[in-house]
């Protein structure tokens, strides 16, 4: 949700329909939000939570809960800005917080309830592109939960693990702890990632999946890498970085077809140089005669 969306919401809540000065009386707003202890996965490092990339994961978020750094209390920010907007339009508002309703409770809601306002998200392929091209952690975390229809990160992570197993992807040693990779408890091998890339290249939405990635020397987190090299514009990938760890995985297009590449560096002194060397070798590598 952006600030413009909040303004539209305030107008709808006051019954103005976009006009000023036609308030119907005090506005009572109940925000159904996760309790604070659920805003971050438990194993996210406390230092990460102060930065935009470690912003709290809430159901209703303004500007992805980031404003320079992370917004430490998204609910209070929403309350403050909503009250200010309603007051600016000549109204008053009372805001209270409640727990989110469950899927069961949603099905039990009365049919006579009326939706006053709805904010539609960007299309799925745009959200996936934000997560993969720009490594936007908040979006990645929300996509994990929405895909599993489970806001509990442990349940959502278990659902992702089961899906990979159902696809025939080797999951030995795999541990999914969150959606963004910021947790130090994630465990994955380059074999698993390469197998996932190959499987997704056969998926009905393969074109959308590849288009969601950064492009070497052109776009996203790879925009400043491999410029002027043979792989510029020919490698679609996803990068990952936490303290001491550097990873890159993706699809390298060659004259002999696609190569599914995954590299994970732990504690290397110059990982980017090594990654570049390996990508160039793979690009120039011809397939074995027996595989043609």
Language-model-detected regions and their locations in the chain:
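Periplasmic/cell-envelope proteins involved in peptidoglycan metabolism and beta-lactam response
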Residues: 1-66, 76, 80, 291
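A small/polar active-site loop signature that marks catalytic segments
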Residues: 18-25, 65-208
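Extracellular/periplasmic catalytic domains that process cell-envelope and extracellular macromolecules
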Residues: 21-23, 51-54, 121-124, 168, ...
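Extracytoplasmic
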Residues: 24-26, 39, 55-57, 77, ...
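Short, glycine/proline-biased beta-turn/loop segments that scaffold the active-site neighborhood
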Residues: 31-48, 91-110, 215-217
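Secretory-pathway/luminal and periplasmic proteins that interact with or process carbohydrate-rich
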Residues: 37-39, 137-140, 221-222
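Small-residue-rich helix-loop
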Residues: 144-292
């Amino acid at each position: 949700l952006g600030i413009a969306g909040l303004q539209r919401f305030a107008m709808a809540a006051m019954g103005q329909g976009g006009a000023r000065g036609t308030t119907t009386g005090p506005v009572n707003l109940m925000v159904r939000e996760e309790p604070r202890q659920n805003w971050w996965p438990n194993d996210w490092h406390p230092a990460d939570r102060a930065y935009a990339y470690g912003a709290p994961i809430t159901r209703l978020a303004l500007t992805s809960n980031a404003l320079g750094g992370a917004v430490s209390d998204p609910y209070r920010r929403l309350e403050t800005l909503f009250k200010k907007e309603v007051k600016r339009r000549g109204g008053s508002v009372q805001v209270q917080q409640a727990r989110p309703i469950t899927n069961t409770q949603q099905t039990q809601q009365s049919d006579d309830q009326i939706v006053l306002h709805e904010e539609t998200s960007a299309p799925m392929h745009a959200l996936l592109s934000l997560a993969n091209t720009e490594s936007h952690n908040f979006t990645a975390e929300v996509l994990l939960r929405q895909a599993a229809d489970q806001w509990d990160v442990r349940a959502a992570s278990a659902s992702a693990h089961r899906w990979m197993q159902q696809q025939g992807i080797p999951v030995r040693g795999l541990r999914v702890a969150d959606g963004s990779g910021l947790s130090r408890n994630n465990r994955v091998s380059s074999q698993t990632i390469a197998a996932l890339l190959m499987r997704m290249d056969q998926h009905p939405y393969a074109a959308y999946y590849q288009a969601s990635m950064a492009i070497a020397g052109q776009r996203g987190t790879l925009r400043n890498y491999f410029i002027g090299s043979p792989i510029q514009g020919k490698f679609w990938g996803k990068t990952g970085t936490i303290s001491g760890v550097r990873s890159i995985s993706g699809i390298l297009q060659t004259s002999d077809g696609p190569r599914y590449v995954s590299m994970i560096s732990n504690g290397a002194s110059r990982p980017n140089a090594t990654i570049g060397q390996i990508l160039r070798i793979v690009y120039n590598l011809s397939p074995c005669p027996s595989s043609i």
